[in-house]
Amino acid sequence: MAKKFDKDSFSGTLIVVLAVSLICSVIVAGAVVGLKPIQEKQKLQDKQGYILSVAGLMDKDTDIGKTFAERIEQRVVDLATGEYVKDAPKDFSARIAGKDPAQSIRIKPEDDLAGIKSRAKYTEVYLVKGEDGKIGQIILPMHGNGLWSVMYGFVAIQPDGNTINGITYYEQGETPGLGGEIGNPLWQQKFVGKKLFDGQGKLALHVGKGAGSDKEHGVDALSGASLTSKGVQGSFAYWFGENGYIPYLNKLKSAGAQ
């Protein structure tokens, strides 16, 4: 006669615990798989929202998907040449490509002003169309190390390739109330209208203590967050240097955004 299962015995309790754990694991795994498409859709919408925001096209009533489709054209740029990549996949992500040795480059330490060690060979750029269909501004991704985190943001510039229309940071882990203020629209507003380059084409934008007195190129550093501010400066120095967007911006100036 088969021995009756005793759930109150040590072995019985262990079997029950393992069975419950297995069932819970299956449920959690199923939930993760089931929710992933929803999470990915939300991440995409959040990113599009930040792009629209830095372009000045976002308010509480904005239909993000519709406005993005109508006003934003995503292109992929070869950073080495500044040319558009014609056969790039629609879902190309420089952030993902940057983790693939075949799609990225190692940055020489002396050139790594942003402290990122490597970057993708290609990156997305976003052309913002006006009501007349003409390109009115270009949104460029930018990232670099702060005090505690990699700071990911967007910079909106005019078609002259020099004048800043806006900046935003959409992901960062700097100290709340200090370095975390890079996400404060009041500080971001200080960049609007600033020129990236001087008359000789050299990067002139600078972020530092008292830099705001330079009305054309300077932005005051965040109070109590010198290392985060230095990271912002380093990000601009790298991405708007010869190893970043300079080849692309030079082509914009000579041929136009189209």
UniProtKB/Swiss-Prot annotation:
Record's subcellular location: Cell inner membrane
InterPro entries: FMN-bd (IPR007329), NqrC (IPR010204)
Entry-annotated residues carrying FMN phosphoryl serine: 226
GO CC entries: plasma membrane
EC number: 7.2.1.1
Disulfide bonds, paired cysteine numbers: none
Superkingdom, natural source: Bacteria
Pfam families linked: FMN_bind
EC class name: translocase
Keywords: Cell inner membrane, Cell membrane, Flavoprotein, FMN, Ion transport, Membrane, NAD, Phosphoprotein, Sodium, Sodium transport, Translocase, Transmembrane, Transmembrane helix, Transport, Ubiquinone
Main location: membrane
Membrane topology term: Single-pass membrane protein
Listed transmembrane segments: 14-34
Cofactor(s) for this UniProt protein: FMN
GO MF: FMN binding; oxidoreductase activity, acting on NAD(P)H, quinone or similar compound as acceptor
Catalytically driven reaction(s): a ubiquinone + n Na(+)(in) + NADH + H(+) = a ubiquinol + n Na(+)(out) + NAD(+)
GO annotation, biological process: sodium ion transport
Subunit structure: Composed of six subunits; NqrA, NqrB, NqrC, NqrD, NqrE and NqrF.
Family of this protein: Belongs to the NqrC family.
HAMAP family (UniProt xref): NqrC (MF_00427)
Function: NQR complex catalyzes the reduction of ubiquinone-1 to ubiquinol by two successive reactions, coupled with the transport of Na(+) ions from the cytoplasm to the periplasm. NqrA to NqrE are probably involved in the second step, the conversion of ubisemiquinone to ubiquinol.
Annotated protein name in UniProt: Na(+)-translocating NADH-quinone reductase subunit C
